[in-house]
Amino acid sequence: MKQIVYVASPESQQIHVWQMDNQGALTLLQVVDTPGQGQPMVIHPARTHLYIGVRPSFGVVSYRIDEKGLLTEAGMAPLPGSPTQLTTDLQGETLYSVSYSGSCLSVSPIDEQGIVGAPTQTLEGLTHCHSANVDTTNQVLWVPCLQEDRIRLYTIGEAGHLTPRTPEALDSVAGAGPRHMVFHHGGGYAYAINELSGTVNVIAIDAAGAGPRIVQTLDIMPAGFSDTRWAADIYITPDGRWLYCCDRTASVISRFAVSEDGGVLRLLGHQATESQPRGFNIDSQGRFLVAAGQKSHHIAVYAIDAQSGALDPLARYAVGQGPMWVSVLAR
C-alpha cells in the first residue's frame, strides 16, 4: 500500500508532499506553493482530491491528486471567513468550513469533477467555532464552539444543507473550550478535546435515546503541569484501540487506551514531541503517527506499538515554516 503524507506550512505558504514506506520512512516528492497561507486540509473520500483553506483572501483550493500522490491545482472558491478547519461529508459531495475568527460555518458543493464551488449556505453567530465533524452515519454535523463551551448539532439534509437538531447542542463544562473531535468506528461514542481545560470528553452519542451526553472527562496533561493549557488536536487509530491528544504549551502527545465498545478511556502516558505541536495525524493502518511542530518547523514520525499504543520515535524531517496541518492518503 502506498501512503502519502501532506504537510501544510502557512508561514512559508507551502505544502510538502512525502511518500511513506512500510517502515515509516519519508521521501520528499513535491513542494507546492499555495496561493496564500494554507492551513486546514482534508482529502476527498474517493482520494482523488485534496482541499486546503487559505488566507488572507479567504478561500478553498482544490488540488487533483495523481497516481503518485502529487498535487495539481484545479480550482479555487471563496469562503465567508478565514478557514480554521475543513471536512467533507462521507460521500464527498459537500465541504464544510468553519471560521474561528469569523464565528461562521459554510456549506460548499463539490462537483462531479471533485472541485469545490462557492458556498450555498452560511451559518453565522457560532462563537469561535473550531471544527465541523460528520458522524459515522453521515447524518449529523457536530460543531464545537470554543467560546460558547458547547458543541452545536445539525442534521445534514439534501445537498448538505444544515438544520439545527433537538437538542440543538451539547454543553461542556464552563471554560473547557471544546475544539476538535473524532468518532469511534462503532458509532456509539465520540471524543472531544477541550483547548482551555486540557481535557478530553467521552460522549455517548445517543444516551438512552435522549441525545448525546458526556460520560467521562479525563485530563490529558502530565501530572504536576502548572502552565497555561493549550490543547490542540485529537485522533484515534482506525481499529479504535488507541486515542491521542496533543498540547502546544507542554509539547506532548498524550496516549489513551480505548475500551472495546469505545465508552471508556484510560490514560497510559505522554510522549515529548516537536515544539508547539499544532497538528498531527495517523496513517490508514494505525501503524504510524506524524506530528508537526509549529515552532520547530519539523515533523516527527513515530511507530505505534500494536500492543501498548506507545510511540517510538523514528525520524524528524524539515518542512516549511510554521507547519500546522498533516493529512495522510492511502492508495
UniProtKB/Swiss-Prot annotation:
GO MF annotations for this entry?
A: 6-phosphogluconolactonase activity
InterPro entries per the UniProt record, alphabetical: 6-phosphogluconolactonase_YbhE, Cycloisomerase_2, Lactonase_7-beta_prop, N2O_reductase_N, WD40/YVTN_repeat-like_dom_sf
User: Looking at the keywords, is Hydrolase present?
Assistant: yes
Enzyme class per UniProt: hydrolase
User: Catalysed reaction(s)?
Assistant: 6-phospho-D-glucono-1,5-lactone + H2O = 6-phospho-D-gluconate + H(+)
Q: Could you tell me the keywords of this UniProt record?
A: Carbohydrate metabolism, Glucose metabolism, Hydrolase
Keyword Hydrolase carried by entry: yes
Q: What is its EC number?
A: 3.1.1.31
- Gene3D superfamilies in the cross-refs: YVTN repeat-like/Quinoprotein amine dehydrogenase
A single Gene Ontology biological process assigned to it is: pentose-phosphate shunt, oxidative branch
User: Which pathway?
Assistant: Carbohydrate degradation; pentose phosphate pathway; D-ribulose 5-phosphate from D-glucose 6-phosphate (oxidative stage): step 2/3
Q: Which GO terms describe its cellular component?
A: cytosol
Concerning Pfam families, the annotation shows:
Lactonase
Purpose: Catalyzes the hydrolysis of 6-phosphogluconolactone to 6-phosphogluconate.
Q: Which NCBIfam families match?
A: PRK11028.1 (NF008258)
Q: Which family does it belong to?
A: Belongs to the cycloisomerase 2 family.
| HAMAP family found in the cross-reference section | 6P_gluconolactonase
Name assigned to this protein? 6-phosphogluconolactonase
Q: Which organism is it from?
A: Sodalis glossinidius (strain morsitans)
- Gene field: pgl
